[in-house]
Every structure is written in structure tokens, then in C-alpha cells.
Amino acid sequence: MRQPMTTLPRDEWHRTIAVNLTSVYGGCMTAARHIDQGSIINISSGAGTGPVPGSGHYGAAKAGVNSLTWTLSAELAPRIRVNGVMPGAIPTEVMLKALKKSEDQLDELLEEWNIPLGRLGTPQDIGSACVYLASDAASWVSGEILRVGGGAKPK
């Protein structure tokens, strides 16, 4: 729901925070209690790094995910590494609906977002970043939010 904060219904605020932040907290707490060592990877969003008119509630939730990631990386070290992945433009059904775009408008979206690598991302791009963060190759990486967006910066 894209709506200015001043007219956003309170129940929509609570629902968005529950889905996008409280659920991440719950997953992190469950993992922290049940694994002796390893990696937790949270999914963030560029919306959590600055103003997103009409989606302030979502941005607030994702900023909370970033803060949770940084805090847990310190609290769970050295046994568990905690990082985040910040996906860029991935043309999922949910994103297209939120932007009121159709699959026929992907070229328009690519141009609008000015992505230096010249293509929209795929779920596999995000998965590959998560595999890296979970691997031994990232054994000295913790408390980081990895942008995976083809070189584009969140607006």
C-alpha cells in the first residue's frame, strides 16, 4: 500500500512492521538459539536507507532490519556471523504490482532506474549473494549489508 505516512492507517503500519521486521527478528532469535556457529542472512531493501515517499512504513521496517543485522552481528560474534543482502531492481510480481508496472514495461523500468550494468536483476543474483555470505569465503564478513543491484544506488 503506497500512502503518505500522515494518512496511513495504524493497522497497516503494524502489519508492515510485523511482516518485514518482527518476522525477521523472530527468525534471527530462533536461529541464534539453535545453531552453534554459522551465518544468519537478512534481506533488506534500499527503502531502508532513505526517504521513500508513499512507502515510509516499509522503509522504516527495512531500516529496522539493517539495525537488527548490525546489532546481532556484534552480539552473536564470534560464533555466528550476521549480514544482510539489499536487493536492487528484481522484477518480481510483488515489485511490479507495487510500482504499478507490467512485464511489458521492464525496459522502461530499466531506463528509469539507470542501472549501470544494463539489466534488471534476477532472484538467482540475490541467491548467489546469500550463498557467498553463508560460505567460508565470507568467514571474515559480519555486520555488512551487501547491495546487489547492478551498480545502481537506492533513490
Model features per residue range: what roles?
Residues G50, C130-V131, S142-K155:
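Short C-terminal tail/terminal secondary-structure segment
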Residues T6, G50-G56, G118, D136:
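Active-site loop immediately N-terminal to the catalytic Tyr-X3-Lys motif
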Residues S45:
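Residue(s) in the substrate-gating loop at a strand-loop-helix junction
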